[in-house]
UniProtKB/Swiss-Prot annotation:
Pro-sequence residue ranges: 1-14
Major location (coarse): plastid
Listed name of the protein: Photosystem II CP43 reaction center protein
Gene (name only): psbC
Modified residues annotated as N-acetylthreonine in this record: T15
NCBIfam families linked to this entry: psbC
Length: 473
C-alpha cells in the first residue's frame, strides 16, 4: 500500500543534516526519519522491512555457526567445557550430541556439523535479506497480499501472532522429539554420574507441570527454576508446545475481542514495545535458570552453581578432617554451631559453616548421602565414594565467580588462575540484556501511547546547535 502523502506529521521529525543523501522511499522527506533511524524508515515499506528482518536473522545464525566452529577449533577434550570459556558447545552437549557417560565428550563431529549447518543457513538468509532489501518489492500488499499487512489491521496482526505461536510450539516439540525418539538428551541425574538417555516416562500431569508456576520464587521453592528432573522438563515442553500451537490456531481463526481492541495500542511501535517486554522477561528468567539450575544446565558442562561450589567446599573439608580423625557429627565451630554439620530451620541435617545459607542445594554428587532427615551421618562416615570426593574438589575450585576483566577466582586466588564460569557469563549477560530490553520497552511503549493519544509532537529543533554549524562538504 503506497502512501501518497508525507508521514512527517505522524512521527518525531528527525532533521537530516545532508538533505541530498536519499534512497528511494527511505529518505527523510518520505518517511520522516533520517538514515540513522534505521528500520523506523521502513515502517510502511513491508517488503524492505522483510529484508531487514531476514538479514538480521542471517547475522544471528552466522554468529551461531562461526562461534560454534571457533569453539570446536579450540576445544581440548581433556579439560571440562566450563574451563575453556565455551558457551555454545555446552548447549549442544546438553542435547546429548557427542557425549558419553559422566558427560565425557566422545565425538566432536556433531559439533562441527552444527556449525557448518548454521553457516550454510546464514548464507541463505543473508541472500534473502539482501534480495528483499535491494531488489524485491518495496511493499508486499499489492503482489503478495498474504504476506502484506497494515499495522492498524487488528485481525491481520493477531493472525501473524498466531503463526509465530505455532512456530514456537513446533520448536518446543523439536526438543521433545530429540529427547524421546532421536537419541535422548543428557541427564545429569542418570545413575552412575550422568549419561545420555531417552526420556520415556514424561511428566504430563498438569498438577505437577503448572504447580511450578504457582510456587514461590524465593528460597527452597524457586518457581519454575526449581525443576530438578528431565521428565518434568520434557513434559513441560509437551505442554508448552501444545499450548502455543493451540493458541496460534485460535489467534489465526478468531478476531480480537472488543476488550482487547480497546485495551491495546495497535501500531508498529506498540508491537515493538510488547515484544521488548516479552524478551526482557525471558532474559531475566534465563538469568535465574542458568545461575541456579543444574538440571537444565548440567554442572558437567557449565560448571557448578554458586551454592553447589560452596557446598562442595564444605564437603571436601569434611572428608579431609574426618580422615584425620575429627568426629564430624559433634565438632563445634567458632560460633558455637556445628563445624561440619548442623540443623536447618526445618530440622534436617545440613552442612555447617558459611554454606548453611545454601542448604537447599540438590546435586547428583551429594544426594546419595542424604537420608530421610537430611544428610545421613552413617553414610557420611561409611559410604562416601572416590568419585564424589573428586567431583566436589573439582567444583570447589571452580566456583562461578569472576570479575569484569576476566580475572577469575576468589579475591585470595593467585594471579595465575584465570577462570570465569560460563554461568557467570550467561547469567550476567542475560540480566544486563533483560534490563536494557525492559528500558527499551518503557521507551517505545511511552512513545506508542503518546502517538495514539495525539500529543506526540517531537522535539522543537529551532535552537539546535547543528543549525548554526558550517556544512561538512
Amino acid at each position: 500500500m503506497k502512501t501518497l502523502y508525507s508521514l512527517r506529521r505522524f512521527y518525531h521529525v528527525e532533521t537530516l543534516f545532508n538533505g541530498n543523501l536519499a534512497v528511494s522511499g527511505r529518505d527523510q522527506e518520505t518517511t520522516g526519519f533520517a538514515w540513522w533511524a534505521g528500520n523506523a524508515r521502513l515502517i510502511n515499506l513491508s517488503g524492505k522491512l522483510l529484508g531487514a528482518h531476514v538479514a538480521h536473522a542471517g547475522l544471528i545464525v552466522f554468529w551461531a555457526g562461526a562461534m560454534n566452529l571457533f569453539e570446536v577449533a579450540h576445544f581440548v577434550p581433556e579439560k571440562p567445557m566450563y574451563e575453556q570459556g565455551l558457551i555454545l558447545l555446552p548447549h549442544l552437549a546438553t542435547l546429548g550430541w557427542g557425549i558419553g557417560p559422566g558427560g565425557e565428550v566422545v565425538d566432536t563431529f556433531p559439533y562441527f556439523v552444527s556449525g557448518v549447518l548454521h553457516l550454510i543457513s546464514s548464507a541463505v538468509l543473508g541472500f534473502g535479506g539482501v534480495y528483499h532489501a535491494l531488489i524485491g518489492p518495496e511493499t508486499l500488499e499489492e503482489s503478495f497480499p498474504f504476506f502484506g499487512y497494515v499495522w492498524k489491521d487488528k485481525n491481520k496482526m493477531t493472525t501473524i501472532l498466531g503463526i509465530h505461536l505455532i512456530i514456537l510450539g513446533l520448536g518446543a516439540f523439536l526438543l521433545v522429539f530429540k529427547a524421546v525418539w532421536f537419541g535422548g538428551v543428557y541427564d545429569t541425574w542418570a545413575p552412575g554420574g550422568g549419561d545420555v538417555r531417552k526420556i520415556t516416562n514424561l511428566t504430563l500431569n498438569p498438577g505437577v507441570i503448572f504447580g511450578y508456576l504457582l510456587k514461590s520464587p524465593f528460597g527452597g521453592e524457586g518457581w519454575i527454576v526449581s525443576v530438578d528432573n528431565m521428565e518434568d522438563i520434557i513434559g513441560g515442553h509437551v505442554w508448552l508446545g501444545a499450548i502455543c500451537i493451540f493458541g496460534g490456531i485460535w489467534h489465526i481463526l478468531t478476531k480480537p475481542f472488543a476488550w482487547a481492541r480497546r485495551a491495546f495500542i495497535w501500531s508498529g511501535e506498540a508491537y515493538l514495545s510488547y515484544s521488548l517486554a516479552a524478551i526482557s522477561m525471558m532474559g531475566f528468567i534465563a538469568c535465574c535458570f542458568v545461575w541456579f539450575n543444574n538440571t537444565a544446565y548440567p554442572s558437567e558442562f557449565y560448571g557448578p552453581t554458586g551454592p553447589e561450589a560452596s557446598q562442595a567446599q564444605a564437603f571436601t573439608f569434611l572428608v579431609r578432617d574426618q580422615r584425620l580423625g575429627a568426629n564430624v557429627g559433634s565438632a563445634q565451630g567458632p560460633t558455637g554451631l556445628g563445624k561440619y554439620l548442623m540443623r536447618s530451620p526445618t530440622g534436617e541435617i545440613i552442612f555447617g559453616g558459611e554454606t548453611m545459607r545454601f542448604w537447599d542445594l540438590r546435586a547428583p554428587w551429594l544426594e546419595p548421602l542424604r537420608g530421610p532427615n537430611g544428610l545421613d551421618l552413617a553414610k557420611l562416615k561409611k559410604d562416601i565414594q572416590p568419585w564424589q570426593e573428586r567431583r566436589s574438589a573439582e567444583y570447589m575450585t571452580h566456583a562461578p565467580l569472576g570479575s569484569l576483566n576476566s580475572v577469575g577466582g576468589v579475591a585470595t586466588e593467585i594471579n595465575a588462575v584465570n577462570y570465569v564460569s560460563p554461568r557467570s557469563w550467561l547469567s550476567t549477560s542475560h540480566f544486563v540484556l533483560g534490563f536494557f530490553f525492559f528500558i527499551a520497552h518503557l521507551w517505545h511503549a511511552g512513545r506508542a501511547r503518546a502517538a495514539a493519544a495525539g500529543f506526540e509532537k517531537g522535539i522543537d529543533r529551532e535552537t539546535e546547535p547543528v543549525f548554526f554549524m558550517n556544512p561538512l562538504n
